[in-house]
Structures are given as C-alpha cells and as structure tokens.
C-alpha cells in the first residue's frame, strides 16, 4: 500500500528502467508513473512522503488492533455480569434455607452482587469509550491517508513534486499529528475513576464477608 512500491535511488538522477519507477501489483495504477529521470529534490521529497504514508498505514493497523482488544474486554465484562446475576439467584436461594442468618446472607448477597454488577457496567462503559476513541482515530488516519494518496497522485502527475505540492502534503500530515495529540491526550485521574477504584475496594471487602458467612453457616449444617 501507499508508496512502498518506490525504492529511492542512491544517485542524483534515476536511469530508465529503475525499480524506483515500478509499482507492485497491489499498487499498479494507483499513482502515475514517474519519468525516467528525476532530480535529487524530487527524490528526497518522495522518500519523505513514502515514510509518512507508511506511518499512517501503521497507525491504522495499530488503532484497529486496539479497537478489537477493547471489544474483547467488553465481551468479558458482559460475561461477568451474567455470572453475577446467576450467582445472585443461587446464593439467594441457599440463604433462605439457612435458619437464623438467611435474611442477613440474602441481604448481603443482593447488596454485594448489585455493587459488583455496577462496577462491571462502569468498567464496560469505560472500555466502550476507549474502543470508540480508537475507532475514531483509525477513521481519521484512514481519511488522512486517502487524502495523502490523492495529493500524491496529483503532485507526481507532471513527473515532479514542487515545493508548494510538498508543503501541502506535509501540512496534511502535520494537521493529523496535531489532532492526534489532542484526541489522544490522557486526562488526570477523574472523580469517576476515583469512585470506581473505591467501589472495587468495597466489592472485594463485601465478597470476603460473604465468603466468611457461607463458610460459617455451611459448617453448622
């Protein structure tokens, strides 16, 4: 993809038939052919543009992989919530059969499972937010690459890349980088994150209490 079909020559001009001018099958027809001889300046500019296009392709691949990873994590939290609901039903049924402490265990069970389920939902919301953030970044990079390819084709249609054309292409990449820094900036620890950490600690304490109550009453049966 991109300009990978170009191979920069080591001399100031490129002889006819050089691999620098050939395109691989996947990119055939994507860009206009360059003339048999190009200047050092055009050669340098093509090399720089080639690196930028490659960088965008790697960014798209990276963002898509992160998007899929957060999607898998989101599926896991869905499974956890389902398991907790089933545990709520089972433990609630067992608790009612324990004389004396059934209501205590039942109340603790519903409270604990509800809290854990709430944490799972909050985590899922955060995962979804990160998933969509990386999806948007992938879309922006894909759009930038398409724009870059369009400008490249137009620039080399006359066999050279002028200073103005090169600057225009570079500005496209710079604008994308600046946007990436703004979108990708990590915020400081928010109130929501602090509350989530607090709830996770409470959930662990609640789980330990439930385990102790179950062990104590099962030993009396």
Swiss-Prot record:
Stated name of the protein: Uncharacterized protein 071L
Sequence similarity: Belongs to the IIV-6 259R family.
Locate the region Disordered.
1-22
- Top-rank taxon of the source lineage equals Viruses
Polar residues biased stretches? 7-16
């Amino acid at each position: 993809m991109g300009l990978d079909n170009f191979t920069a020559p080591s001399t100031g001009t490129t002889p006819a038939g050089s691999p620098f001018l050939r395109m691989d099958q996947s990119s055939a027809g994507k860009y206009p052919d360059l003339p048999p001889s190009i200047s050092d300046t055009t050669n340098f500019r093509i090399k720089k543009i080639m690196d930028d296009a490659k960088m965008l392709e790697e960014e798209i691949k990276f963002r898509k992989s992160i998007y899929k990873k957060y999607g898998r994590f989101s599926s896991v939290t869905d499974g956890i919530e389902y398991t907790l609901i089933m545990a709520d039903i089972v433990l609630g049924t067992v608790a009612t059969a324990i004389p004396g402490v059934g209501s205590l265990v039942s109340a603790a069970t519903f409270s604990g499972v509800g809290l854990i389920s709430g944490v799972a939902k909050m985590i899922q919301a955060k995962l979804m937010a990160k998933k969509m953030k990386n999806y948007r970044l992938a879309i922006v990079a894909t759009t930038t690459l398409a724009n870059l390819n369009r400008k490249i084709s137009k620039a080399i249609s006359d066999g050279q890349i002028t200073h103005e054309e090169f600057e225009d292409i570079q500005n496209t990449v710079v604008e994308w980088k600046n946007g990436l820094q703004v979108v990708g900036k990590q915020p400081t620890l928010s109130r929501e994150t602090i509350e989530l950490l607090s709830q996770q600690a409470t959930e662990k304490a609640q789980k330990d209490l439930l385990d102790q109550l179950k062990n104590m009453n099962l030993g009396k049966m």
